[in-house]
Amino acid sequence: MRTVLVVVAVFLLGGVAMAKEKKTVQDSRIGNLSKLRREQLSAKVSEIRSYLREASVADTNAERLLSFVAELEKEVRSRKYGLIFEEHKERVDIELEENIPVLTENKKCFIDNGGEMNFLIEGDNLAALKLLEKTHRGKIDLIYIDPPYNTGNKDFIYNDSFVDKTDGYRHSKWLSFMEKRLKLAKSLMSSSGVIFISLNDIEQPNCRVLCDAILGECNFCGQIIWRKKAGGGQTDDFFVTEHEYVLVYRKTKAFEWIDDTIVADAGFNKEDDGGKFKAVKLEKWGSSAHKEDRLTMWFPIKDPAGKKMYPIAPDGLPGRWRVGQKRMQDLEKNKLIYWEKKDGRWVPYEKIYSIDGDLSKIKKVKCRSIFYDEVGGTGDATDMLTEIFGKKDIFSNAKPVSLIEELLVHAKANFILDFFAGSGTTGHAVMKLNSEDGGKRKFILVTNNENGICEKVTYERLKRVINKEKYAAKLKYFKVDYVPITEAGYWERAEELLKYIRELVELENGIDFVHDKSVAIVLTNKEAEALQKDKKRLALCKTIYKGPNVLLTPEIKTEYNIDVKTIPDYYYPELED
C-alpha cells in the first residue's frame, strides 16, 4: 500500500513523462497554455489510473484511490473560464442540513384591500428560496435584487458577523454567498424571465462573471449605469462617486424587452427637413404629472423667445417633464424640440420621425443605458421614506420607487420577486405601477428581520402606502421556520409537515385559503367525504391537496376536472428517500 501511495505522489509531483504524444517546442510556447497544462495533468492522471489498475487487483485501497483519481480528473477538466474563489459554508447551510424549512403565518399582519395577493417572507433568503423552489419553480417573470455591496463598512453580514475590509476572504465569502442564491433564482425564473441586480464598483466585475457562469454569457442583456446622486461629498479617494450599476440578464431568448412606444393623436402630420414627424408633448400628462411626483424632472428650459419656462400639469399646477435634464439637453442640441404657442404660452414637443417614411409604423424608442435624472436618486428614496414614516433615518441607501418602476415597465411580468427586499421599495413600486396602468402584477418579498427591519420597516411601509394611497392589494406575512430532521419514519415526518402545508398552498396559488374556494385541502377521509357531497363547492374547486392516506372518488377528476395533489409529498418529495 505504501508503494502505491508513493507512486501516486511521484506522478502528481511531475516524476512521470507528460504525454505519450509530446508537443513540439513551438507548440508549447504558443496558444492556450492553461489548456496545455490541463492536458499534461490529465495525462499524468491517466497514467496513475493505469498503474493503480495493474498494481493490485485484490487491493481494496486501490479502488478507493481510483475514486480519488476520478475526482482529480474531473477538477482538472472542469472550469476553463470564470471566477476562482474559496467556497464557504454558512450557518444557514448547516441549518438546512439538519432541518426542513417550513413557513408559518403571522395572521395579525394580513392586509386585505382588494386586488392581487402578495407575500412578505421573513427569514434567511437561502431558506426562503429553497421553499419557493417548491411553489414557484419556473414561474417568476422578473427578479430585482439589491444585495449587500460588500463595502467593508458593516453592510455585509456573514454568519452573524460583519465582513470588513481586512478579511482576506472578503470577496470569496460574498461570491460564495451570491452563487448559491443566484443558482436558486435561476431555477425560479420563467423561460421569458429577467433578473436585475443593483451593484456598485466593488463587486460589479465579479458578479458579471458569476452571472455569465450561472445564467450564460449569451443571456447578458446589458448594464445600466444609474446616477444615484448629483455631486456630493469629497470623501472618496479619487473621484466623487455618483453612479451605481444594474446588471440585466434574461433566462432564455424568450425574454422580450419592451421598448417605449410613442403614440400621438395627431399622427405624423408635421414635416421639416428631417421628414414627417409626430409632435409628442414634453410636459408629463396622466398619473404622476406633478412637480412633487418627480422633483428632479422639474427644471426650466428656454422658450423660442429666450424666456425661462417650467412645466405645467394638465390641472394647471406645477408639473414635470417627461424626460430628464440630460435628455432635454440632447433634444435641444439635436433640434428635436417642436414649439407651439397655446393659450399665450409656448409648449414644447418632442419630434418623433416616421420610420423609413412608413406612417403606419409606430416609433419605438430604445431605453438608454445611462439613467440620469429620469428615475430619481437615493435622495428621492430617503425623502419618500421620511414622508411615509414621518421621521428621518429609517433605512440607509434605499432605491427610489421610480427606478424600480422604470425596470418593471420594460418586461411582461406577472410575478415579481425581490429576495433582498430591504425597505420594501420593490413592493411599493409594483403596487404604484398597478394603480397607474391597471396591471395585475404580484410580488414576493424576502428579507431577514435584523434589527426588526422586516416588521418595523418593510411590512410597515407596505401597510402605510396601501392605506394612504388606497392601493388595491392584499398582503400576507410569512416567516421561515424549521422542523428538525429525525430518524422517524415517513408517516411521523409527514404528519409533522402537514401542519405547515396551508402556507405553501397559499403561496403557490396566491390566495387566502379561508376566502378562496378554488382550492381545497383534505387531510382525512372524513373531510374528503364531506367535500365530495358538496356539489357547489366542487363546481368551484380547481385543485385538491389531499393527505397521503386520503381516498377520493374517480368522479373528482372525470366529472369535475379537478387537479389532485398528494401532500406533503408534492412539496417534500425528499420524504420518500
Spans of model-derived segments:
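Mobile active-site "lid"/loop adjacent to the S-adenosyl-L-methionine
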Residues: P148-F177, R181, S190-S192, E203
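Small/polar loops that bind or transfer phosphate-bearing groups
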Residues: I121, S198-L199, D418
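Basic, amphipathic juxtamembrane/active-site segments
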Residues: D155-H171, M431-N449
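Conserved SAM-binding loop and adjacent beta-strand
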Residues: I121-G123, G390-S402
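Short glycine/proline-rich turn/loop motifs
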Residues: K107-G115, N159-T166, G379-K392
